[in-house]
Amino acid sequence: MTFDKTIPKATIKRLSLYYRIFKRFHSENIEKASSKQIAEAIGIDSATVRRDFSYFGELGRRGFGYDVKKLMNFFADILNDTSTTNVLLVGVGNIGRALLNYRFHERNKMKIAMAFDTDDNEQVGQTTSDGIPIYGISSIKEKLIGTDVQTAILTVPSSKAQEVANILIDAGIKGILCFSPVHLSLPKGVVAQYVDLTSELQTLLYFMNQEQF
């Protein structure tokens, strides 16, 4: 299947939402869903749903709705959720520990396979209650040998983010989910997504203030 190469980032960011909604519809034994139903479930307008879906070819027929099981499988495929994706985590501070305790594999086919921190961190050498080993960062290349891990979650102080990113890239990591409020300098072939909790909270507060006027 050939997709439009100019898919907007806003559309791409909604793909996981569509996948989640179709999984929910499927669990509720809903076989067909209209663009209006999908839009209401996500909190957008139906025109946006139809426009988003148009980038991926013919996903449904006007007046007939969308086949829930078919679309659930479609989004699982393009989001690579048909087989388990192992990821690693660097930084076992407060955010890192919270993510280690979040059981991704129970909700999606993602699993934190190992975690890393500075070699002198007291947690190095330990294993979490879910069996995730914690290693010193200097051993990352060695630990990745023979694994399929190409994705990393980065939860380190901003001042260390680029340095650690360089270590990850040198070890063969191709994708980084960064919780540090900095923009990483990355070589071609390596991609990053950023989670800035402060920015998201400030945006929320802005919208809350707008509602008061």
From Swiss-Prot:
Its main location: cytoplasm. NAD(+) binds at G91, V92, G93, N94, I95, G96. Residues 17-56 bind DNA. Pfam families: CoA_binding, Put_DNA-bind_N. Keywords: Cytoplasm, DNA-binding, NAD, Repressor, Transcription, Transcription regulation. GO terms for biological process: negative regulation of DNA-templated transcription; response to redox state. It is found in: Cytoplasm. Transmembrane segments: none annotated. GO terms for molecular function: DNA binding; DNA-binding transcription factor activity. It comes from the Bacteria. One of its GO terms (cellular component) is cytoplasm. Belongs to the transcriptional regulatory Rex family. Modulates transcription in response to changes in cellular NADH/NAD(+) redox state. Homodimer. This is Redox-sensing transcriptional repressor Rex. It comes from Streptococcus mutans serotype c (strain ATCC 700610 / UA159). The lineage of its organism: Bacteria, Bacillati, Bacillota, Bacilli, Lactobacillales.
